[in-house]
């Protein structure tokens, strides 16, 4: 029952007569509907219902939602015309008329997901409906506000709804403040502040904020930075503006806008998108530029904010972060193929063929219940026409926590990322990226055929910006993806966000490259906390530069990556070197031999949580594609795990045939491994194959094998002890001055620049020197006293010399490989071979030790032993001889004692050749000749 009140404060709400406001308080209307339509022409954000009376004509009409409820999320699509409210008084102050019971009612949506459109109208040039553009779940397709607008009347203190088309700022204190419902965002204020920011921002403001004496940028402090950016966007025809959010903090007028961007990204980013278009038009008109304005009107500009605060850990995200802008860092594990994501659904009536377009609201299609034509109004007659719908490119990326964000004793968390349009395929598995996006949650159906939802919601990040470069890491070698770029015909800058090198940085790089001690300077800068090991550091330095990957038109591809193995005694800093290289490589994976399996290194089959389909997950070697894979405890690997490395280290591919998935994956990575000798102590009296538990075919695939031995030397031990104790007293080693070590940021920038821009070509003089050095290394095996020649070098050593020479020339920023580059490569190869391929019995280099595990002398001794066994068996009177008697007679004819294991090995070889027959087992074994041969 309605009660009439005489209180003046309730008169406006309960009175059955419409309220006519004071005409003097009406704010001025702007001629340009840049942000709003009037209430009579827009798709209003206020919906009501009145079944008791007809409304008079000539007033503004607002569409009504049937059965509207404050608890329902409406669709952003067009709604059917139902009952109409009367809008009286000044335009924009909307109040409902009284119902039959004398009580007025409001029917509105708590949160409508509308946002700003383009500066042109929602109609095309010919007056026809135009499909609106929309980025991700951020709507920019309507000139109405993203949410319902509220007027706050300062005179009465009463909140009233407002759909005014005025965009002018309030000029009097008595005028209402217009904000988006549910937020503190004023569209007009936000637009004005961001426009002033774009037109007036200078880098001196950021310099003051950061309190830095030097700002790394190619602009002066007084230059209008974003004016230059907008002009470059217009000239290049691009539509994306990367916005450093900290610049908003540096500009005093946009400090509040920075916090609004973090808390209400869906609304603020839409306003920024529209403001950029208005600024582009203003720049063209004000400067009288000869440019087609229609092209600006039809283009969809996007703001991509980043650097919105410190990066959060994935396990720190909570419900308070939903619908807010966040920063995340992680490792890309997997990315799906491109998915067509429906943005605008197209419906057609099966009765009258009337069509209508419906925008998707948070992944939900608000299907029309009946035809919107008044003459038809047929229920359940609208059907979806797929080929008339609008779709956008979408990709889902699996992001995992990096080790620095994982607490002790915890397993890494992962989260799903959704990227759209230009960000699709912007990163690959193995990339370390920093993303900026909106944290969202969506309900999950208990059954796909029912509408029952689970109480737990699924979360994901709607990405607006992706950054892949760290100042302390190298950039990805673009030569590894050259073939992919040629096939896709895209610019590599769109695929990889490489580090921006300024003119000042380039001048410093040239200055360092001109130093005479460049080679030793860069080598000292590699792991400066590790004492000495100069040759090891030089080899790793050349590995970071790498050779040049070559693909020939006649077929065939030659790798430019360099593989290095560190072998030696414990406590010789092998693992620390691996850790340092892993920290500065862009796509490196650090793993241990004992904790790795074959599928963990290559790829494995798993079932996707979302689609329930079998998918291929990348392993450590695939994730290191284009980087360096560091493997510690290489000798502890199982045989099945090591077998997969043979193809990777030479062909740089991984062949997979599992669960119906047959494919070949790229593994174009360098291998840096470390191994401990058998018994944890290297025995110099044994060859390298007997000291290291590695098969010879795998050992021969390493370009450089360094023996890091712990030798007793009083002078060296004293210097090493001083170095270690100084590390506990200061962060910088005592024997190295500040000028002798380059900062890690500059070192990575130098290497990245060389890998990106320097591709040396081998000259004729270098070619002649390579041939001469290779032939000279082969001649080292000549021995006039022996019929069989020792192999001291193979073609793999020649290819290794070519790669090292290219890396040395690339280090000096030279476009050609000269004689000195080849000489240094030959020196490194000979130094490494001298250590690990020397026969301890003869003191000579023998590559058979590395390739077959046996030297020429050992092979000759085994042949002589087999010949002696055959002679003993032929000279005996009986048909067979016991094994113990055979050992006794062999030792009688030999000057040196022959071990039973050597005799057993010789018998096994003779038995395989069907020359002898061994009967029995153990000490009862007997040996006789095979007379049938």
UniProtKB/Swiss-Prot annotation:
Compositional bias segments (type: Low complexity): 27-42, 86-103, 164-173
Localization (cell): Nucleus
Source species, domain of life: Eukaryota
Its job: Acts as a component of the MCM2-7 complex (MCM complex) which is the putative replicative helicase essential for 'once per cell cycle' DNA replication initiation and elongation in eukaryotic cells. The active ATPase sites in the MCM2-7 ring are formed through the interaction surfaces of two neighboring subunits such that a critical structure of a conserved arginine finger motif is provided in trans relative to the ATP-binding site of the Walker A box of the adjacent subunit. The six ATPase active sites, however, are likely to contribute differentially to the complex helicase activity.
Assembly mode: Component of the MCM2-7 complex. The complex forms a toroidal hexameric ring with the proposed subunit order MCM2-MCM6-MCM4-MCM7-MCM3-MCM5; loaded onto DNA, forms a head-head double hexamer.
Note: Present with 8800 molecules/cell in log phase SD medium. Early fractionation of eukaryotic MCM proteins yielded a variety of dimeric, trimeric and tetrameric complexes with unclear biological significance. Specifically a MCM467 subcomplex is shown to have in vitro helicase activity which is inhibited by the MCM2 subunit. The MCM2-7 hexamer is the proposed physiological active complex.
The protein, known as: DNA replication licensing factor MCM4
Organism field: Saccharomyces cerevisiae (strain ATCC 204508 / S288c) (Baker's yeast)
């Amino acid at each position: 029952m309605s009660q009439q009140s005489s209180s003046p404060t309730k008169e406006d709400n309960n009175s059955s007569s419409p309220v006519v406001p004071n005409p003097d308080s009406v704010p001025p209307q702007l001629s340009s509907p840049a942000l709003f339509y009037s209430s009579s022409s827009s798709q209003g954000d206020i919906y009501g219902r009145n079944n008791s009376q007809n409304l008079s004509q000539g007033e503004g009409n607002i569409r009504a939602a049937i059965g509207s409820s404050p608890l329902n999320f409406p669709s952003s699509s067009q709604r059917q015309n139902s009952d109409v409210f009367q809008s009286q008084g000044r335009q924009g102050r909307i109040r409902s008329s009284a119902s039959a019971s004398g009580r007025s009612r409001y029917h509105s949506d708590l949160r409508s997901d509308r946002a700003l459109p383009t500066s042109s109208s929602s109609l095309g040039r010919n007056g026809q409906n135009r499909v609106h553009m929309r980025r991700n779940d951020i709507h920019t397709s309507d000139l109405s506000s993203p949410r319902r607008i509220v007027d706050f009347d300062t005179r009465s203190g009463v909140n009233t709804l407002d759909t005014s088309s005025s965009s002018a700022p309030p000029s009097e204190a008595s005028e209402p403040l217009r904000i988006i419902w549910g937020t503190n965002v004023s569209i007009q204020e936000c637009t004005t502040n961001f426009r002033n920011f774009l037109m007036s921002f200078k880098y001196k403001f950021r310099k003051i904020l950061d309190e830095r004496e030097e700002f790394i940028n190619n602009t002066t402090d007084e230059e209008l930075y974003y004016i230059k950016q907008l002009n470059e966007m217009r000239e290049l025809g691009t539509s994306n503006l990367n916005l450093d959010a900290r610049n908003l903090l540096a500009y005093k007028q946009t400090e509040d806008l920075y916090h609004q961007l973090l808390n209400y990204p869906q609304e603020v980013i839409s306003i920024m998108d529209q403001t950029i278009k208005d600024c582009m038009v203003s720049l063209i008109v004000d400067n009288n530029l000869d440019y087609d304005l229609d092209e600006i009107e039809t283009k969809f500009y996007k703001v991509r904010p980043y650097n919105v605060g410190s990066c959060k850990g994935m396990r720190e995200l909570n419900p308070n972060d939903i619908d807010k802008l966040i920063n995340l860092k992680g490792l890309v594990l997997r990315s799906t193929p491109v998915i067509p994501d429906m943005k605008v659904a197209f419906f057609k009536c099966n009765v009258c063929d009337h069509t209508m377009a419906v925008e998707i609201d948070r992944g939900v299609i608000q299907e029309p219940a009946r035809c919107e034509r008044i003459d038809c109004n047929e229920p359940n007659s609208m059907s979806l026409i797929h080929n008339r719908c609008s779709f956008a490119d979408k990709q889902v990326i699996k992001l995992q926590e990096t080790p620095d964000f994982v607490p002790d004793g915890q397993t890494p968390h992962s989260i799903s990322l959704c990227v759209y349009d230009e960000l699709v395929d912007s990163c690959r598995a193995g990339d370390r990226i920093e993303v900026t996006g909106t944290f969202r949650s969506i309900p999950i159906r208990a059954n796909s055929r029912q509408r029952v939802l689970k109480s737990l919601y699924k979360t994901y990040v709607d990405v607006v910006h992706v950054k892949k470069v760290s100042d302390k890491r190298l950039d990805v070698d673009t030569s590894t993806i050259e073939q992919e770029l040629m096939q896709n015909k895209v610019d590599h800058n769109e695929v990889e966000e490489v580090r921006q090198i300024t003119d000042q940085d380039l001048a410093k790089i040239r200055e360092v490259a001109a130093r005479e001690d460049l080679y030793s300077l860069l080598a000292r800068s590699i792991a400066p906390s590790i004492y000495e090991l100069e040759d090891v550091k030089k080899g790793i330095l050349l590995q970071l530069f790498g050779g040049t990957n070559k693909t020939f038109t006649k077929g065939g591809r030659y790798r430019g990556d360099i593989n290095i193995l560190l072998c030696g005694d414990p406590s010789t800093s092998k693992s620390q070197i691996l850790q340092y290289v892993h920290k500065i490589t862009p796509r490196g994976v650090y793993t241990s031999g004992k904790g790795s399996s074959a599928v963990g290194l290559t790829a494995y089959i798993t079932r996707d949580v979302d689609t329930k389909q079998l998918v291929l997950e990348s392993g450590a070697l695939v994730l290191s594609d284009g980087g360096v894979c560091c493997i510690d405890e290489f000798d502890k690997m199982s045989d099945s795990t090591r077998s997969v490395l043979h193809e990777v280290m030479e062909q740089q591919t991984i062949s997979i045939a599992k669960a119906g998935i047959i494919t070949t994956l790229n593994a174009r990575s360098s291998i840096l491994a470390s191994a401990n000798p058998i018994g944890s102590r290297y025995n110099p009296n044994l060859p390298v194959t007997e000291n290291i538990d590695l098969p010879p075919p795998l050992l021969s695939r390493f370009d450089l094998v360094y023996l890091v031995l712990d030798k007793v030397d009083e002078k060296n031990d004293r210097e090493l002890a001083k170095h270690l104790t100084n590390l506990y007293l200061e962060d910088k080693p005592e024997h190295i001055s500040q000028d002798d070590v380059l900062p890690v940021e500059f070192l990575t920038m130098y290497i990245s620049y060389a890998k990106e821009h320097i591709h040396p070509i081998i000259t004729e003089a270098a070619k002649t020197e390579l041939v001469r050095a290779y032939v000279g290394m082969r001649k080292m095996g000549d021995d006039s006293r022996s019929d069989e020649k020792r192999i001291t070098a193979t073609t793999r050593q020649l290819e290794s010399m070519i790669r090292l020479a290219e890396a040395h020339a690339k280090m000096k920023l030279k476009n050609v490989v000269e004689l000195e580059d080849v000489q240094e490569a030959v020196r490194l190869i000979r130094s490494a071979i001298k250590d690990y391929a020397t026969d301890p019995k003869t003191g000579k280099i023998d590559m058979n030790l590395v390739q077959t595990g046996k030297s020429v002398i050992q092979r000759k001794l085994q042949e002589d032993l087999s010949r002696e066994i055959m002679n003993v068996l032929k000279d005996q009177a009986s048909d067979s001889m016991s094994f113990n008697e055979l050992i006794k007679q062999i030792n009688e004819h030999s000057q040196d004692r022959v071990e039973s294991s050597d005799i057993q090995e010789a018998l096994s070889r003779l038995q395989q050749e069907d020359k002898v027959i061994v009967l029995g087992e153990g000490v009862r074994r007997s040996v006789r000749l095979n007379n049938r041969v």
